[in-house]
């Protein structure tokens, strides 16, 4: 039968002789575990931050783009909200001065962006634009170039719009894009009336989606990837 007393005495003696090595070993294990936990936590936080920033850049959880009109989609009923945009390059004019310039016209319908916001001067410009009527939001570069003011008229195709606000920033739009072809937002309801979208026009159609928090977007769209 084992002599447990002797075993304990030997173990205690070895422990006293090698206590510094044992403490170093235990400390290494503790530090290693702590490092693994910290790295794992950092990775999760980094992934979360990247996802959040991507949403801020897109202004939505998911964006579908096509050069043809995007009809009803299977995922429409799964989304909390959707918005649509039609954008294309076109000349716009300022009737007060007769000046004109190439711009990126964006006809918007819905509450896009779902993340971030359209920053305007005055701050009420976005709300005024969405309240209805022939209102437009005009990028600051364009406003400065033609010394335009909020309340002035801008002509897009055959329709005249009152400038409701000066656009300062838009989710997903770079400074280069704004310099080459500054954006002019108009309500989708008046797009057809402008007469600018005709057969053969180079037009891009966007559909924006926002889903419930923690929705796995990749898993959600997987069954429809071949269709898109």
Model-derived segments and their meaning:
Residues 2-228:
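Membrane transport/envelope proteins' first extracytoplasmic loop
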